[in-house]
Amino acid sequence: MSNQELEAAIEAAWDARDSITPATTGATREAIEETLAALDGGGLRVAEKQADGSWHVNQWAKKAVLLGFRIKDMEIQSGGPQGGGWWDKVDSKFAGWGESQWKAAGFRAVPNCVVRKSAYIAPGVVLMPSFVNLGAYVDSGTMVDTWATVGSCAQIGRNVHLSGGVGIGGVLEPMQAGPTIIEDNCFIGARSEVVEGVIVREGAVLGMGVYIGQSTKIVDRETGEVMYGEVPPYSVVVSGSMPSTGGVSLYCAVIVKRVDERTRSKTGINELLRD
């Protein structure tokens, strides 16, 4: 089916979602499975960047991810320690892969990383022991470091570094209108969290332990401007606080400067790790 045909089929299935079960067959099941396969292979994305820099969200693709839960039964997934396993209804992206599939995929997956079916991982990505949820998109040259989490339908650009323990929020629960987006060439410092559909624009650097959601104040130290929901391109952002009522200060994220060569030397990717 074309994307237009898939969209129409998914929208119809969404309207009748309460009737969809693992026993569902025919065009409805085919549309859901084909959409999930397109997401998995990178031919379709939940969100796409437009020429003017805005992001268009394919809401129907997000709906297909949710409908995928309706057509699968729970089952044992083997491979745990001491012969144990897991109980789930979402397949691993790597289920049934042999050497030829790994070579064709072109990314590195360190033992104990988890990627769920319908997430796309581009060639040149390095996955340390981390978690990438369904519907996500991780573009080429990106490092997903140890214990980092890429949430459902999140969009991660090229040559991004997600440091240890970083959390990039998903959209499925609680439901968000748009996915969390990290654009190309960003550096997200250890244990930082970016959630609720926030967009981190190209080349931005978040220091260690920066937390940004839609209600987080993002303050430009130089101008005093306060913004929400979007980190400007090539900003260097650290944790801070702002005075509030009652003599207390509340958390905020502070833009302390724009990226310069000194910052780039500390946050640049190491090509040796991508070979």
Curated annotation (Swiss-Prot):
It is found in: Cytoplasm. Pathway: Amino-acid biosynthesis; L-lysine biosynthesis via DAP pathway; LL-2,6-diaminopimelate from (S)-tetrahydrodipicolinate (succinylase route): step 1/3. It comes from the Bacteria. It catalyses: (S)-2,3,4,5-tetrahydrodipicolinate + succinyl-CoA + H2O = (S)-2-succinylamino-6-oxoheptanedioate + CoA. GO terms for cellular component: cytoplasm. GO terms for biological process: diaminopimelate biosynthetic process; lysine biosynthetic process via diaminopimelate. Keywords: Acyltransferase, Amino-acid biosynthesis, Cytoplasm, Diaminopimelate biosynthesis, Lysine biosynthesis, Repeat, Transferase. One of its GO terms (molecular function) is nucleotidyltransferase activity. Its main location: cytoplasm. The keyword Heme does not apply. InterPro entries: DapD_Trfase_Hexpep_rpt_fam, Hexapep, Hexapep_transf_CS, THP_succinylTrfase_dom1, THP_succinylTrfase_N_sf, Trimer_LpxA-like_sf. Substrate binds at residues 108, 145. It holds the Pfam family Hexapep_2. Its EC number is 2.3.1.117. Belongs to the transferase hexapeptide repeat family. HAMAP family: DapD. Homotrimer. This is 2,3,4,5-tetrahydropyridine-2,6-dicarboxylate N-succinyltransferase. The lineage of its organism: Bacteria, Pseudomonadati, Pseudomonadota, Alphaproteobacteria, Rhodobacterales.
